[in-house]
Amino acid sequence: MNIGTVPIIACSFLLPTSSLLAQSESKDSYSEQAKFYPSEKIEWKDGPPALPKGAKVAVLEGDPAKEGAFVMRLLFPGGYHIPAHTHPRTERVTVISGALYLAMGDKLDRSAAQKLSPGTYGFWPSGMKHAAWADGETVIQLHGIGPWVITYLNPAEDPRNANKSL
């Protein structure tokens, strides 16, 4: 056998295998698992107690309250704001519509905020201190690893503490 025939023989063994792999991973094999969420069919619910009243949420994948990956959309009414806070895990946010303003630091400093327009993607690392507000009705898509936790820098601004002072 000459050295030039070795690659040809090796390829002849690999071709049937790669053909089988391609068949097992065909587009049709994934159709039962695919899920689509047209914007007009998304079912919005009241936001979680950890967010100020007025937010709406739609969980698209996973469960933000449990360990593991999740995707959720948040709808904020115009003027809605979230006081300065942190998250123990990285957040990945895409603005779908409206405008989200993000200010880094201990307080909601509107003069130092970054405007995130539709289509903007943002990545905020775990522990980053930030505040946000919506200019007009705003929808964002948040990707994260649960459980999703928000810790307000000022406990008095945490909506979960509102009823504790009564």
Annotate each predicted stretch with a short phrase:
Residues 1-5:
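Positively charged n-region of N-terminal signal peptides that target proteins for export
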Residues 7-18:
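Bacterial N-terminal signal peptides
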Residues 23-70, 114, 157-166:
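A short, N-terminal "cap"/entry segment at the start of jelly-roll beta-barrel domains
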Residues 33-35, 111-114, 131-166:
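Double-stranded beta-helix
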Residues 57-60, 71-80, 84:
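N-terminal post-signal-peptidase region of extra-cytosolic proteins
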Residues 77-80, 86-107:
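Glycine- and acidic-residue-biased ligand/ion/polar-headgroup-sensing regions
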Residues 82-84, 102-103, 124, 129-135:
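Short beta-strand His + acidic residue motifs that chelate non-heme Fe in jelly-roll/DSBH
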Residues 106-126:
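Short acidic-glycine-tyrosine-enriched beta hairpin
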